[in-house]
């Protein structure tokens, strides 16, 4: 049970190395002219970096650059604007931070000069992650650095900004707030703007904020860098208004390559709804010495399963959007620093975060589309030699999702779990939920939110709520019969209407 058996391969393995695409096309926002090449170096010591930066990189244990670093850092050091496309876990954080820090160093920035570099990123956790890397890289530099994110103390942030923060890492909403309202925030000397995970920033609704931010920030002689895992029309529009004409387009996600890391073993298991929790419980119980992330589709489902597993002495951490920022931050770093453990979370942790040495990614609730799948599994097998495994739970009615994954170049195997290895604790689970008022309420909330999330899936041909066996779904939440709940069902996951569907006892 600790390692599922590999039944059969769904796709071929990748055999090609990532390449750089630097040709000029209108689709790529007038990228560098054909024939222009970046300097190909492999070691950090081959770059003309300052001693404080080289000393920090050595202390961090890095010697050889990843593909995206080798392709991106030289042109950025030369002052070029860059539009970058790279796999998650490719090392792009160092790729943009090193040139930014070198720029501050060469200009001898001091606190009184204000903010010279701004890094914009979609989520608080990713901002904290980048801030942590920046802190290590700037250990031997005199320049100042800081972070502004939603949920943190705004007044304390404003005080630091007024004292002078040379490099600022920020989420879009809080950055716009400070740009508009914090007197004494000096950003007139801005020299570089970095937009990380641009597609995700736009996906979660920050398009208007980004346009306002770019309009406010000075653009004279400003270097800009935009990184995005996918190149959508909206990303191209954002690149057009934020980058100078003729940016260098660097692509290390070629069409012939698999969309996920080479060191990642990926599989799925076909499981009826009423057996899902039993299988998950059995798997986690037998892999307590591993480091595991379990993805669920809603905050309430995370809260329920975390409460349940902790109650029955299977210790887990939880991370979701309804937690206060300090709790999210503490949980994130606790799991990062742990050698083993289980983190149950929503997709808040699925993008960009670099959590060390994750052994397994479990997609207990299925992702909305292949891009979400790729970002989830990107939490393991990170770096050039990273290894990891992933397992996705699918019901028999959801197998159509495999076609979408195959079209997105995701190699997948089917795993089988012997039934005699699955713990049959259903009756004990139902007794517990019936007798414990708090768990009963959180189970009901989790059940309702699961159905709500299912109804909001964008792939309606795969995830059809009218084909869900509600009695079996209810059993996975510890109910012998479905509880009565209200859910909102819309024609699209983006704009559900007010039609109600009731599920009865």
UniProtKB/Swiss-Prot annotation:
Residue positions, PTM Phosphoserine: 12
Record keywords: ATP-binding, Helicase, Hydrolase, Nucleotide-binding, Nucleus, Phosphoprotein, Ribosome biogenesis, RNA-binding, rRNA processing
Any GO BP annotation: maturation of SSU-rRNA
Summary of pH dependence: Optimum pH is 6.5. Active from pH 5 to 8.
Residues covered by the Helicase ATP-binding domain: 73-249
Composition skew (Polar residues), residue ranges: 26-37
Bipartite nuclear localization signal, short sequence motif: residues: 275-291
The keyword 4Fe-4S is annotated on this UniProt entry: no
Top-level EC class: hydrolase
A GO molecular-function descriptor: RNA binding
Free-text comment about domains: The Q motif is unique to and characteristic of the DEAD box family of RNA helicases and controls ATP binding and hydrolysis.
Protein name (record): ATP-dependent RNA helicase HAS1
Note: Transcription depends partially on SET1.
Pfam hit, one: CTE_SPB4
Enzyme Commission number(s): 3.6.4.13
